[in-house]
């Protein structure tokens, strides 16, 4: 897969790093590095990124970016999300390229 001009690093706002880290570790097995009170980096095995401290977090419904995560087993991933404290806002649906 070409890597030129592909998303290389992703930064997202978060108001509660511990909750964000706990959720993504449990639901998706992401690895985290703590860089102090204002930043927490992650790696999911394919992309690196981080969460920066912000009290002004938004949702896709309010104009924030919609990020699609790939999963081989959608039903199992849905169960992992729920068991990790996440909420399903839109159930599994057909998506272009999926």
Report residues per predicted region.
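Vicinal oxygen chelate
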Residues: 68-98
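N-terminal beta-strand motif that seeds the catalytic metal site of vicinal oxygen chelate
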Residues: 1-21, 48, 65-67
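Conserved strand-loop elements at the edges of beta-sheets that form or border functional pockets
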Residues: 14, 44, 94
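Short secondary-structure junctions
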Residues: 28-35, 87-91
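Residue-level hotspots at or immediately adjacent to binding/recognition sites across diverse folds
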Residues: 17, 32, 50-52, 64-71, ...
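Conserved short beta-strand elements that form part of the metal-binding/catalytic scaffold
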Residues: 30-62
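Conserved active-site tyrosine of GNAT-family acetyltransferases
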Residues: 23-24, 81
């Amino acid at each position: 897969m070409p890597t030129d001009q592909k998303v290389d690093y992703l930064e997202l706002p978060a108001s509660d790093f511990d909750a964000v880290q706990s959720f993504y570790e449990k639901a998706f097995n992401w690895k985290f590095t703590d860089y102090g009170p204002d930043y927490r980096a992650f790696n999911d095995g394919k992309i690196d990124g981080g969460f920066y401290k912000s009290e002004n977090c938004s949702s896709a419904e309010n104009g924030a970016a919609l990020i699609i995560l790939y999963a081989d087993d959608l039903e199992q991933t849905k169960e992992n999300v729920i068991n990790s404290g996440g909420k399903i806002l839109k159930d599994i649906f057909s998506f272009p390229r999926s």
